[in-house]
Amino acid sequence: MSDYKHTLNLPETDFPMRGMLPKREPGRVSQWQDMNLYQRLRDARAGREVFVLHDGPPYANGSIHIGHAVNKILKDIVVKSKSLAGYDAPYVPGWDCHGLPIEHKVETTHGKHLEADEARGLCREYAGAQIEGQKTDFVRLGVVGDWENPYRTMDFANEAGEIRALAKMVEGGYVFKGLKPVNWCFDCGSALAEAEVEYADKKSDAIDVAFAAAEPEALASAFGLASLDKPAAIVIWTTTPWTIPANQALNVHPDFTYALVDTGELLLVLAEELVESCLTRYGLEGDVVATAAGASLEFITFRHPFYERVAPVYLADYVTVEEGSTGIVHSAPSYGLDDFMTCREHGMSFDDMLNPVQGNGVYRDDLPLFGGQMIWKANPHIVDTLREVNALMAHTPITHSYMHCWRHKTPVIYRATAQWFVGMDREDDQGRTLRQRALDGVEATQFIPAWGKARLHSMIANRPDWCISRQRNWGVPIPFFMHKQTGEWHPRTVELMEDVARRVEAEGIDAWFRLDARELLGDEADQYDKVTDTLDVWFDSGTTHRHVMRGSHPMGHDQGPRADLYLEGSDQHRGWFHSSLLTGCAIDGHAPYKALLTHGFTVDEKGRKMSKSMGNVIAPQQVMDKLGADILRLWVASTDYSGEMAVSDEILKRTADVYRRIRNTSRFLLANLNGFAPERDAVAFEDMLALDQWVVDRAAQLQARIQGAYAEYRFRDVYQQVHDFCAHELGGFYLDVIKDRQYTTQADSRSRRSCQTALYHVVEALVRWVAPILSFTAEEIYEVIPGTRGDSVLLEEYYPHLATLEANAAMGREFWSRVLTVKQAVNKCLEDARNAKVVRNSLAAEVTLYADDSLRETLTQLGEELRFVLLTSEVHLASLEDAGSAQAEASELEGLKVAVVSSPHAKCERCWHHRADVGTHAADPNLCGRCLSNLPEGPGETRRYA
């Protein structure tokens, strides 16, 4: 038997079958850095329409987790897809650098007794080191951005910009002084920063207190009962009896289940999970008569145990069901931050908040029962009073870890004190409030997914004033001078703030803390107090639309500070989206963004949150080291980001399987471009074979859909379209059909060059489609495509050379759609024949298609070449009426029956078709006549269609 391998055009490529991504990707990152890809992109798109995705800054503390990876990959896909569409799409990554977590890290390492300026220096140093670590991982993910020039909220220019933004809001009349609970030391007589608080053991009275139902009918209804047959009460647990006189609400978790427990003489409301432990503590027995979700208890009122007032139930996410508690929290808003925020969110004004504890720890004299008593000494009196009114369910002295002043080693409480706020309902000079402007901003914003609009609208509509001050050391200062007698701002406050901003721009925030007031106020200095508060870190990031986009990193956007897109996790409706909206509306009168895209949180394959204790944490660093960043990127693109995003080792393994399909398809395309030079060998669309025209037309249609999907941030659709194209239209049809023509026709024949031209157009388009997602692999593919290449696929735009079929083409879209349907039906019949051992494979088969007139007319157009489409050695067409006398099977296609028989002819050793003329040619009895003509010295085969 002769070896005909050398006469075939077998596939050959340098593109490897195995990705070996963990090994190859770091080299690609280095290549991008060496070529300064980000700047090359800026230069290539200069003068084009600008698209700005403004980066919400992650906190500069700790290693990145899978949520960070999801966020940065989604942003990178957006930016790269916009660049692919021809936009100038800058991406400036940022970091949030101030705040308590970094202060704590520095204190843990260096101790709490640092001088303030030394502590700030160490915080700055720590944040810088954390940024470098996170940046390394983000770059390794394949995220392209201005990594050499990111924005950092601790950069002097941004710290100064923040002060200028605050000045604008002061000028607009939005900033005022109000109340908020802070750490308070009676011995210091002042508020304490978190850094000035330490924890030590303290003996306390743990008490369970019953609040009698004031609305038994409403309580019965909440539990699905017609009425209550005995008195009812809700039970709270606390270790601070001294706060009971200031109680104003009761908090339950909206998602917890609460039980109504019959103890004989009294019905008790307790968290269902804690019923058994609570009854044991009370020395009672009881039965659960009904249950209800916490949300159904909202606004039902209960009577204060010893004062003539009621406390409503509010919903609060911070409520827990830890052992020893009841699942209900008593709320004294002046003495707990969570209590304060919950009551403010439910509309309680500052004036309505009870604040009977004075700065020295003594109740005001006008407090009934306990006026004039020091709170620690009042505790046993309060316990006795609760016992006397039959409201004390349990009393247990405990020793627990509690806040103490680091100077005096004495207990500290939360106490409402004066803080700085941004007012939501103060009218500006146009008679509009910030709340109204912000709600208008919500309405003017596009939300992806759409449900985000209602969520943010509700938050803005119901939120309290924004407390922007913190008693922190590591933060941007609130540079106010307040008159000692009147409490009023200095009349030149805005002017003075600009002076401070210039100093901060040169020296950083230390410029304010070191400042002697006389430098700015002269002889007036003695009349004014210098404010030492710092700004909430949400104000830091919430004003980046101003001090980054219009300050440190101007992005050339035609609409100033209004970004095209903010993209963050769903928690940012309450966070960055929220603070940015408020500052944007206060400063510029509109939202700082046109659209908000929200993604869900990552969970495991069972929908559980990730935690080290459960062992279900997926670390992006480990995924990159084991599978490669492109697998992580493909998983992100393939997942519906609008909800929870499930990830696990098994899910990533399935993602890797899809990746291999795309990679192998690309490899087949490249391998069959062996010997093809597009400048020399490309065939004009009108001269291509009909099947090749069809696949180019399909690619053109697909590209239009992919462009639309990218434009609308439907990355999962892009993934599905590409995967389906590779798996079905290419892998399941076109690539199978063209193998015979590609391998067996003469190397330079029109038939082969037509096919190669189609493959070339398809791979040129495909590599661009996947580049925003599979950036590493796309570069690898791009480098191997024949023809003139640029330096990076990421510098390219959508492939412009995909021709389309005429609407009235004889072999147009409808024609090939019918042919494809026939092929699928015939494939099923061939599979049945193989299973029945009628034939070994499709090329060993001859088929007769009994088709109705319409179908037969379609198939007749392909003539002799129909067998190449069906991958059989022979095809006969007959009328459907003739099927009755033949052993034909009904196919899955109406109007078609198929008869499959084993070919009686010998197999050609070169093309493997079974043909009647094999053995009849003296020149080579092992070959069919077609293969003889396709040998290099032969005249060549002519194909017209397939």
UniProtKB/Swiss-Prot annotation:
The keyword ATP-binding applies. Zn(2+) binds at C908, C911, C928, C931. The keyword Zinc applies. ATP binds at K612. Its EC number is 6.1.1.5. A motif ('HIGH' region) lies at residues 58-68. It comes from the Bacteria. L-isoleucyl-5'-AMP binds at E568. Its cofactor is Zn(2+). It is an enzyme of class 6 (ligase). Keywords: Aminoacyl-tRNA synthetase, ATP-binding, Cytoplasm, Ligase, Metal-binding, Nucleotide-binding, Protein biosynthesis, Zinc. GO terms for biological process: isoleucyl-tRNA aminoacylation. Its main location: cytoplasm. It is found in: Cytoplasm. One of its GO terms (molecular function) is isoleucine-tRNA ligase activity. A motif ('KMSKS' region) lies at residues 609-613. It catalyses: tRNA(Ile) + L-isoleucine + ATP = L-isoleucyl-tRNA(Ile) + AMP + diphosphate. GO terms for cellular component: cytosol. Binds 1 zinc ion per subunit. PROSITE patterns: AA_TRNA_LIGASE_I. IleRS has two distinct active sites: one for aminoacylation and one for editing. The misactivated valine is translocated from the active site to the editing site, which sterically excludes the correctly activated isoleucine. The single editing site contains two valyl binding pockets, one specific for each substrate (Val-AMP or Val-tRNA(Ile)). Monomer. PANTHER family: ISOLEUCINE--TRNA LIGASE, MITOCHONDRIAL, SOLEUCYL-TRNA SYNTHETASE. Belongs to the class-I aminoacyl-tRNA synthetase family. IleS type 1 subfamily. This is Isoleucine--tRNA ligase. The lineage of its organism: Bacteria, Pseudomonadati, Pseudomonadota, Gammaproteobacteria, Oceanospirillales.
